[in-house]
């Protein structure tokens, strides 16, 4: 079900200074930007570091790509996962937040609307 790590979400107080810092220090390059986040690319993977100013739980920073969020949620729920947040729409498709039987968050994304480019 989990295909890959799609992104790691990092909270920052200022997108402009954080973008400059992650470019200068870590060699990441901006891929896209909106008013609350910037997707930063790494040279050897298509996974992104997403710098953001949103009020999100810090334990939900890693997002896994799946083929279909609603189907994946149903399968995981049958296997014993708890649904912290039911599937909801995001720019690229659908997202949901599960909790495994050990208390760990499992954030799922699909790209049913297509990959973000700007």
Please state what every model-predicted region is:
Residues 1-19, 46-47, 60-62, 112-118:
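N-terminal beta-strand motif that seeds the catalytic metal site of vicinal oxygen chelate
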Residues 17, 34-38, 91, 115-116:
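Short glycine/proline-centered loop/turn elements that form peptide/ligand docking sites
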Residues 27-33, 82-87:
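Short secondary-structure junctions
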Residues 7-9, 39, 50, 61-63, ...:
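Short aromatic/hydrophobic contact patches that present stacked aromatics
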Residues 21, 70-75:
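Short amphipathic alpha-helices within nucleic acid-binding modules
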Residues 28-60, 105-111:
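Conserved short beta-strand elements that form part of the metal-binding/catalytic scaffold
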Residues 2-4, 54-59, 89-90:
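Short glycine-enriched loop/turn motifs at secondary-structure junctions
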Residues 73, 78-118:
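Vicinal oxygen chelate
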């Amino acid at each position: 079900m989990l295909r890959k790590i799609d992104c790691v979400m990092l909270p920052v107080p200022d997108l402009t200074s954080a973008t400059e810092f992650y470019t200068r220090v870590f060699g990441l390059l901006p891929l896209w930007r909106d008013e609350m986040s910037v997707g930063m690319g790494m040279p050897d993977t298509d996974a992104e570091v997403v710098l953001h100013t949103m009020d999100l739980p810090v334990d939900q920073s890693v997002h896994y790509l799946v083929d279909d969020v609603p189907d994946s949620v149903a399968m995981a729920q049958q296997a014993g996962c708890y649904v912290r947040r039911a599937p909801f729409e995001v720019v690229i498709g659908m997202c949901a937040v599960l909790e495994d039987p050990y208390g760990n968050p499992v954030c799922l994304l699909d790209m049913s609307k297509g990959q973000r480019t700007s």
